[in-house]
Amino acid sequence: MVAQGLLDFQYEADPSSRGLTSLGGLPLYFDLIKASGLGAAIRRHVRAAGGQGWLDIQMVLAVIFLNLAGGDCVEDIERLERDGGFSAILRAIEKDLLSRAERRSLKSRWRRERERATPSPSALSGWLERFHDPNSPKAVAGKAFIPAVTEALRGLWRVNQALLEFLHEHQPAKSATLDMDATLIETHKRDALHCYKKFKAYQPLNCWWAEQGAMLYSEFRDGNVPAGHEQLRVLKESLRHLPESVKKVALRSDTAGYQAELLLYCGEGKDPRFGVIEFAIGADVTEAFRAAVLATPESEWKPLIRRVDGKSYVTDQEWAEVVYVPNWAGHSRQRADYRFLAIREPLRQLELGDEQELPFPTQAFAGKGLHKPFGMVTNRKGPGDGVIWWLRERCGKSEEVHSAMKSDLAGGQLPSGLFGANAAWWALAILAFNLNAAMKRLALGESWAAKRMKALRFHLIGLPGRVISHARRWIIRLGGGTQALATILDARQKIRALAHGPAG
């Protein structure tokens, strides 16, 4: 036998590989899809598929499983199709996820017997293109333009709303802290536009629900649209997606949210449902703001102390509340109480004149040297340092979530040159993210809540096994010991209980 490599082992194809799977834990998500009513929500809201071929529910679930399994692109659906065990279990339980009318329609939707368990890449691409409006004006460089949301895409967001209502029903929270932040998705699509960082990109504006650890809403945008553009409109749309039992909302944003209409809307209680919305938002460091910072007495500056696990750590930053009333705040009809906080961070080891080359504003303080100033505006009560740390909670989490969407899931590799198809792909990646959030929080337990997809694939989803049919039952026999099996069985029992209503 010819040596295959340096060491004494050989690779061979296994002719008896039928039923083998490397995704032994992935079918656990079928249980949660059934319990959450996700299939019914897809059936009720998504209307993209035609009268022939694959159903909308089959398409949506295929993309969700592609994301969970680690796929990056439409072509990776073939990885699921070639997994004999997963394909077998998908075919076997598909009927339990379809309505009676859908099951009856399957035969008439296909001219000959269906051979695949999952849609082909070409079928999936064609379905995604149905989310695009061919009559929508084309975006052009130099102008911020956001295409209207198509009815098909709106349907996907209604499905996401239904999933979050299920999560909220079993993990209720009367308040919602919303973090608004944009992220750049680099692309080489011909019609994509350049972002502020000078590469081609799309830039969705996202609204994260901190208490539920889930994405509430996202507006897909071209890369040349500024993050703060029409942020109030996106906030209003996000608020409409919150469950009825949520009574209070708070908002956090970086300086992209420093928009007069947004601040006045929140501060003056203009929202008909939530009234005053508490917020902390990064403020622009304008010349007027810098003057107010310089006018603040040294006695007002306090060290910014970080508290971790009951211990206090003095940072090199200081903060102070500054007397500053910008024009928009002076026009407030309700005389809302806006507070401005300043943070200063010392800049060390700078040569004379180097501050002119820095990509951020600097400020010299008498006797204190050169500093990098930051600003924020809030209508929250309480100590200023507490508000600062509350705002900063969003920063690391936003970066983590965006990384998960673009690297752990398939959101970072867009499938099409059509805006609407890419918007649907992004929405489906978010749907997969939120389904996984529900799995961790409601079924797997607290120890799994902080785990990212890499850990879930290693310990749960990517388990080796064999799928067999015996006595009219389908069985997934897992390899790799009993710990993973115990985790899955416990999760299945919890999901079974979820299907019968909220705890308590």
Where are these regions (language model features)?
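Basic, amphipathic alpha-helical segments enriched in Lys/Arg and hydrophobic/aromatic residues
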Residues: G412-L478, T482
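Dynamic "connector" segments at or just before major functional cores
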Residues: M1-A201, N206-N224, L232-E244, P272, ...
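Domain-level cores of phosphate- or acyl-group-handling catalytic modules
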Residues: V225-A288
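Short amphipathic alpha-helical "interface-anchor" segments enriched in bulky aromatics
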Residues: I77, G384-A424, L428-M439
